[in-house]
């Protein structure tokens, strides 16, 4: 990243997400999004907002997904030596009994010098998968990453 500018990059796009299942387990949604990458010292701050593209009410397989996944998220990325830490948080911004959100923490670390990384992920909240977006999930993941 260039130290001269606070805004390092931005993205605009169309995001399609689907679980690839057939009805009745089918879940999908389409969003237009905007994301900025800002650098504050060694910390990268990446807010993203989205607009869900409307679907036909008769065929919408998750009509209340916005109530669980909200309208945006915030990602914090902190590279530290050969390690990378990421925190992703989202909330539906309903500060009442319908309040829903999620937080995800990722840690990648080198295993060897050939580009293979260890990966640990902690997740708590709603929207971890499309089929169960409306169910709260608490999960720990351990694995390998080929890139980061």
Pin down the residues of each PLM region.
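Generic recognition of flexible, low-complexity loop/linker segments
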Residues: 107, 129-130
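Outer-membrane beta-barrel "beta-signal"
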Residues: 137-148
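Flexible, glycine-rich linker and terminal segments associated
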Residues: 121, 129, 146-148
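Outer-membrane pore/translocation modules
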Residues: 1-81, 89-91, 96-98, 118, ...
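Short glycine/proline-rich, acidic loop/turn segments that cap or connect secondary-structure elements
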Residues: 113-116
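Beta-strand elements of well-folded, non-transmembrane domains
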Residues: 18-20, 111, 148
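Short, electropositive alpha-helical surface patch
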Residues: 100-111
């Amino acid at each position: 990243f260039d130290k001269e500018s606070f805004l390092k990059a931005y993205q605009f796009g169309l995001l399609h997400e689907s679980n690839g299942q057939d009805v009745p387990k089918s879940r999908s949604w389409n969003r237009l999004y905007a994301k900025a990458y800002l650098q504050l010292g060694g910390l990268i701050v990446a807010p993203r907002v989205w607009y869900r593209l409307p679907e036909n009410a008769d065929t919408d397989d998750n009509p209340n997904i916005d109530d669980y996944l909200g309208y945006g998220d915030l990602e914090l990325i902190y590279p530290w030596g050969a390690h990378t830490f990421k925190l992703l948080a989202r909330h539906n911004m309903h500060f009442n009994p319908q309040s829903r959100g999620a937080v995800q923490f990722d840690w990648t670390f080198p295993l060897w010098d050939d580009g293979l990384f260890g990966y640990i992920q902690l997740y708590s909240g709603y929207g971890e998968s499309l089929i169960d977006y409306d169910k709260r999930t608490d999960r720990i993941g351990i694995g390998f990453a080929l890139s980061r």
